[in-house]
Amino acid sequence: MIKPRTPPGIMELLPREQIAFQRMLDVIRRNYERFGFLPIETPVFELSDVLLTKSGGETERQVYFVQSTGALANAAAAADEGAENGGLPELALRFDLTVPLARYVAEHEHDLSFPFRRYQMQRVYRGERAQRGRFREFYQCDIDVIGKDALSIRYDAEVLAVIHAVFAELGIGDFKVQLNNRKLLRGFFESLGVAEGELQLAVLREVDKIDKRGADYVRDTLVGEGFGIAAEQVARILAFVAVRSEGHADALAQLQALEASVGASATLGEGIAELREVLELVKALGVPERAYCLNFSIARGLDYYTGTVYETTLTDHPQIGSICSGGRYESLASHYTKSRLPGVGISIGLTRLFWQLREAGLIQGIAESSVQAMVALMDETRLDDVLDIARRLRIAGINTEVQMEPKKVGKQFQYAARAGIRFVVLAGDDELARGVVAVKDLVREQQFDVARDELASTLLVELEQAKAMP
């Protein structure tokens, strides 16, 4: 007999936890739609040459490739399949939703209205090293705005407002959206003589590791043999990326001070102007000052980000790390089309976020079941009555389960309690003869009679009151 088990790096939930997870998905979806984003889905696997066009960083080394059983069984066929794509299998599982989005927009460009506002909530796959809190299969919940030829920086501010709306409704504690612009980093590097190209991108990736690995690690890496940057330059880089702001006025003051201290640089000036406009619009969008700040160390590891970048953290739980991140990209879709399709977006890694919140004891106030009432069957002869009662409750919008086999009342109460069902409806001979049913509230341990015709309205009131209970 084979032992039942899941592969490492998978989060599989019991129904009560799945309900909590699903409700978080619902909150995210609801807020995405409130801001006018439209849903799409893309295939779980893409053509390898399309998917790996410009991922960069660690991600490309974590891709799962897909081969047919026929290709695996026939070595020659497998070799032929791989030879068409530089030795790689033809298909690969998506590692994020941004690259498939770029392919989607380029492929359907003539059928879409621009700016195209999309949300997408699907699983993605990465070959992470199996360890606690790291997942190989996980949900990402993304929004992106794609423009045609150009995309106003104003959308960067709106995306931040969406982040705020989502996490404010999720109610998981105070949070802060940390803002930066990669043009600031690039312009500053240019002033130090760190040239454009691969070196600059590599330095950006290392800077992005400061919060996880620490400044000493980044310093040692940048002065080491792989980079060979002078210690004095590295010290200036670390001082630059240590800049933080508190409050709206301080953020603007930090940008003004940077502009005065570094001097003329087209790239740096562009980044400062973009960040300044984002900050002003975020204020106009009603995002409270406590919810955002500048953090010049935020770079984002993926190479396709070119301007604004975001990372969101929980104020009281910094150990959880980033709970939402993203940024602007100018040229990702240019690998699939001659049209210029710039975009800006963010992603919530919901699987890891849920796991971290559960570990921290922050998943609270969630009903244990999506079933709101159960109608007990105590006598086979009353099945038609029980089914009619359940039908009426469902018409009223109450999620209702029916016990299809007669059992002792005590056993049905035990079942409902274990399943997390709060209200049990009893329709025995005595109750039905009086034109009533009995309702057992398993949380308050109270039982009351209600007229059969008034059951649905009474339960709706009880359910509304139950929502308000701590």
From Swiss-Prot:
One of its GO terms (molecular function) is histidine-tRNA ligase activity. InterPro entries: aa-tRNA-synth_II (IPR006195), aa-tRNA-synth_II/BPL/LPL (IPR045864), Anticodon-bd (IPR004154), Anticodon-bd_dom_sf (IPR036621), His-tRNA-ligase (IPR015807), HisRS-like_core (IPR041715), HisRS/HisZ (IPR004516), HisRS_anticodon (IPR033656). PROSITE patterns: AA_TRNA_LIGASE_II. It is an enzyme of class 6 (ligase). GO terms for cellular component: cytoplasm. The keyword Transit peptide does not apply. This is Histidine--tRNA ligase. It comes from Xanthomonas oryzae pv. oryzae (strain KACC10331 / KXO85). The lineage of its organism: Bacteria, Pseudomonadati, Pseudomonadota, Gammaproteobacteria, Lysobacterales. The gene is hisS.
